[in-house]
């Protein structure tokens, strides 16, 4: 009898991507989640993957059960039912650790840039050689019998520890997830443990002092802009159309590359992709051709226009990510007003990085703050508010509410950069609706 894979929490970004990948490989897949809409469900619906509400009736002993990491006995009826009846299940990262053993696997780890880099690597490789992939924006592609598997490798709660890939990219090490990690040393320790799992090669950003501290049985290739990097980008040109650079491996030029993406961080992402592909022996001309056609991933500098107004949607929710996103906006729109609309994500992160958030938000011309989006894992003890953060920002900064986003209308030809990992897209949609109403009234 054909096995059924049931996903508890199928709308999660990693879970939805994994479900899609298994479906494309011909597996029978279904899943359950809340009835709220998530952007990840669109691909599942297009693939006709059954989406069910949480219910213990969904759980059968013959199913392969895969559970999202956030779900426990006390908050999910399916997990409670499985435990009560002794039905085995695997967490997402546990299942993935076993799954990748059938491929030459390439992980992408790092505090920032995982999803964009995974998407870029998957795009390039899948256009050259059969490659299955799993991206953190909810995108997955499964090819039965493919040689390579590209996946996003998450450090939170050390979820990447069941993974033993042949190769990995490490984009950076930074302190995040203060609800779990105690500090930068704790984060670095997690990456060191992960490095020990890698079988054939690590590609690490060379200007990151903590990545330089790592040791591993597999060789470590550093990439960046400095002379002591194994893979180095030179002759960098950043314009309103994207970025271009020459790539060198230990002094030997391996190609000229153009990527239609913005910000220094995306040059580094592209260089890491070039490094992996070069190490695998892929043709550099083909790599250059397919880098040029990369169009990004969901919720990473995703642009749209409403009349003359530019709206950018980005998942940035850490100071380092906000700085990179605003830098990218400046590169593409150097002569326009940059308006940051940021929703802090989790109270623990907002408390831990309040000063850093204020500092990087000053890179915008004007700042608006949405109410803090608390996670399901925490309780608001009223230790910090969005207004507290606004008071720290030197540039003009206001707090807005979802039921009144009209202050955002005060900027002619503004470039609005909506950033956050909570429900910031609701503010964005409210603003788009308001813009459309204003445009209609003016006609």
UniProtKB/Swiss-Prot annotation:
Enzyme class: ligase
Binding-site residues for ATP, renumbered to this chain: 110-116
EC number: 6.3.2.8
Catalytic activity: UDP-N-acetyl-alpha-D-muramate + L-alanine + ATP = UDP-N-acetyl-alpha-D-muramoyl-L-alanine + ADP + phosphate + H(+)
Primary localization class, coarse: cytoplasm
Family annotation (InterPro entries): Mur-like_cat_sf (IPR036565), Mur_ligase_C (IPR004101), Mur_ligase_C_dom_sf (IPR036615), Mur_ligase_cen (IPR013221), Mur_ligase_N (IPR000713), MurCDEF_pg_biosynth (IPR050061), UDP-N-AcMur_Ala_ligase_MurC (IPR005758)
One Gene Ontology CC term in the entry: cytoplasm
One GO term of the biological process aspect: peptidoglycan biosynthetic process
Location of this chain's protein in the cell: Cytoplasm
GO molecular function: ATP binding; UDP-N-acetylmuramate-L-alanine ligase activity
Keyword set, alphabetical order: ATP-binding, Cell cycle, Cell division, Cell shape, Cell wall biogenesis/degradation, Cytoplasm, Ligase, Nucleotide-binding, Peptidoglycan synthesis
Pathway: Cell wall biogenesis; peptidoglycan biosynthesis
Superkingdom of source: Bacteria
Family per record: Belongs to the MurCDEF family.
Described purpose of this protein according to its UniProt entry: Cell wall formation.
Entry-linked HAMAP family: MurC (MF_00046)
Protein name from the UniProt record: UDP-N-acetylmuramate--L-alanine ligase
